[in-house]
UniProtKB/Swiss-Prot annotation:
UniProt keyword Transferase present: yes
UniProt GO BP: organic phosphonate catabolic process
Organism: Syntrophobacter fumaroxidans (strain DSM 10017 / MPOB)
Signal peptide (residue range): none
GO molecular-function term, one example from the UniProt record: 2-aminoethylphosphonate-pyruvate transaminase activity
Protein purpose: Involved in phosphonate degradation.
Pfam family membership, one: Aminotran_5
Name of the featured protein: 2-aminoethylphosphonate--pyruvate transaminase
Length: 371
C-alpha cells in the first residue's frame, strides 16, 4: 500500500511514545515476513549493527533486540546483568527510576535506591559517596531522560563516578537514544537500554540493549527469566544470523529498519535533536504566552517532553483541555508528578515546528472556552 493511500490519522500524538510515525514507516508494515527467512534475519542483523554505530564510534560493543515494551528490555537487562550475589543501586528522580527499583524487588535482587525526589537533579557526588559507603554494590542504574518531568539527568557525570569505582553502569536511555547526541563509551555505560517507539520513531513491539561485549559475555546463567534472558537472546542472534529465540514482531522490525533510514535521511541524531529542540522552543514560548508555567527550570529540561503546571484558573481542568485539543487534532499527556498538579506535552516523533505552531493556536482557542 502506498503511503498516500493511508487514511490520515485523526490526531498528532504529543506524547513520550508511542508517538506519531511517518506514512512510510507505516507503509512498510503491509508485508508479512517469515521469522526463519534469511532476508528477514538480515534486516535484524543490519539493525543491530546500525544501533551500535549510533551508540558509539568505539569498539567492543554489541546489541540485542528483545520482544515487548521498553520495560521488558529494562527487566531483561537488569535480570541478566546482575549476578545472584550482586547488588543494584538505582538512582531515581521519577516514576521510571522507581520502576527499576520495583523490578529489582520483583526479581528478588539485593538493591538500594538513592532517591532525589521528582524535581531533584541527581548529584554525582552523592552517588559516589553512596557507592563508597556500600562495597556490596556491584551495579548502578539511572534513567537518562526521566519523562515523569522531562528532566535530562547528568548521566555522563554519574558514569564517571560509577566507573572510577569499578562498578557496572546501566543507563535507561528509553526516551533519549536517537534524539539526544550521546556516545555510550563517553557515558561509561556498560548496558544502554531503549525502545523502538521513541526517538528513532518506529512503532511499539520491541526494545533493545546496547552492551559492552565483555560485560555481556559474563552474563551466561544469570537471568531470572526464560523469555527475558538477554544473554541467550544475544547468543542466538550472534550465532544464528539474527534469529530470535521466540517469535519476533516482524512488522515492527521492518518498520524500525525504515525508521533508521529516515533518521539518516534527516541528517542523523544531531539534526533530529535540533528539530526536537525547535519544537520545544515554539511550544514553551507559546504556552507561556497563554499563562502556563513549566515545572522545571530550563537548565534541567530535555527537548523530549515538557511538564506544565496546571493553572489555578476557574473552570480549568486537564480532562477538558485534553478533549478540546483532541477535537482539534492533538493528543497530550496527563501529569505523573505527585508533588504538583501538571500535564505534559511531548515534542518528539514525526512532529515538526509547524505542528507546534498549530498546537499553540489550538491551545489558545481551547483556553477561550474556559473563559
Amino acid at each position: 500500500m502506498a503511503p498516500r493511500s493511508f487514511p490520515e490519522n485523526p490526531y498528532i500524538l504529543l506524547t513520550p511514545g508511542p508517538l506519531s510515525t511517518s506514512p512510510t514507516v507505516k507503509a512498510v508494515m503491509m508485508r508479512d515476513w517469515c521469522t526463519w527467512d534469511r532476508d528477514y534475519n538480515a534486516i535484524v542483523q543490519d539493525i543491530r549493527e546500525r544501533l551500535v554505530a549510533l551508540a558509539t564510534a568505539g569498539a567492543g560493543y554489541t546489541s540485542v533486540l528483545m520482544q515487548g515494551s521498553g520495560t521488558f528490555a529494562v527487566e531483561a537487562a537488569l535480570g541478566t546483568a546482575l549476578p545472584h550475589d550482586g547488588k543494584l543501586l538505582v538512582i531515581s528522580n521519577g516514576h521510571y527510576g522507581d520502576r527499576m527499583a520495583l523490578i529489582a524487588g520483583y526479581l528478588g535482587m539485593r538493591s538500594a535506591k538513592l532517591d532525589f525526589g521528582e524535581t531533584g537533579r541527581p548529584d554525582p557526588d552523592r552517588v559516589r559517596d553512596t557507592i563508597e559507603s556500600d562495597p556490596a554494590i556491584t551495579h548502578v542504574a539511572v534513567v537518562h531522560c526521566e519523562t515523569t518531568t522531562g528532566m535530562l539527568n547528568p548521566v555522563e557525570e554519574i558514569g564517571r563516578a560509577v566507573k572510577s569505582l569499578g562498578r557496572v553502569f546501566i543507563v535507561d536511555a528509553m526516551s533519549s537514544f536517537g534524539g539526544i547526541p550521546m556516545d555510550i563509551a563517553t557515558l561509561g555505560a556498560d548496558f544502554l537500554i531503549s525502545s523502538a517507539n521513541k526517538c528513532i520513531q518506529g512503532v511499539p513491539g520491541f526494545g533493545f540493549v546496547i552492551a559492552r561485549r565483555s560485560e555481556l559475555e559474563q552474563c551466561a546463567g544469570r537471568s531470572r527469566s526464560l523469555s527475558l534472558d538477554l544473554f541467550q537472546q544475544w547468543k542466538e542472534m550472534e550465532t544464528k544470523g539474527g534469529k530470535w529465540r521466540f517469535t519476533s514482531p516482524t512488522h515492527v522490525v521492518r518498520a524500525f529498519a525504515q525508521a533508521l533510514n529516515e533518521l539518516d535521511d534527516e541528517g542523523g541524531v544531531a539534526c533530529r535533536n535540533a528539530r526536537y529542540r525547535e519544537n520545544r522552543r515554539i511550544l514553551t514560548a507559546g504556552m507561556r504566552a497563554l499563562g502556563f508555567e513549566c515545572l522545571l527550570p530550563e537548565a534541567l529540561q530535555s527537548p523530549i517532553i515538557t511538564s506544565f503546571l496546571t493553572p489555578g484558573r476557574p473552570g480549568f481542568n486537564f480532562n477538558s483541555l485534553y478533549q478540546e485539543l483532541k477535537s482539534r487534532g492533538f493528543v497530550i499527556y496527563p501529569g505523573k508528578v505527585s508533588e504538583a498538579d501538571t500535564f505534559r506535552i511531548g515534542t518528539i516523533g514525526h512532529v515538526f515546528p509547524e505542528d507546534m505552531h498549530r498546537l499553540v493556536k489550538a491551545a489558545k482557542d481551547a483556553m477561550h472556552r474556559f473563559g
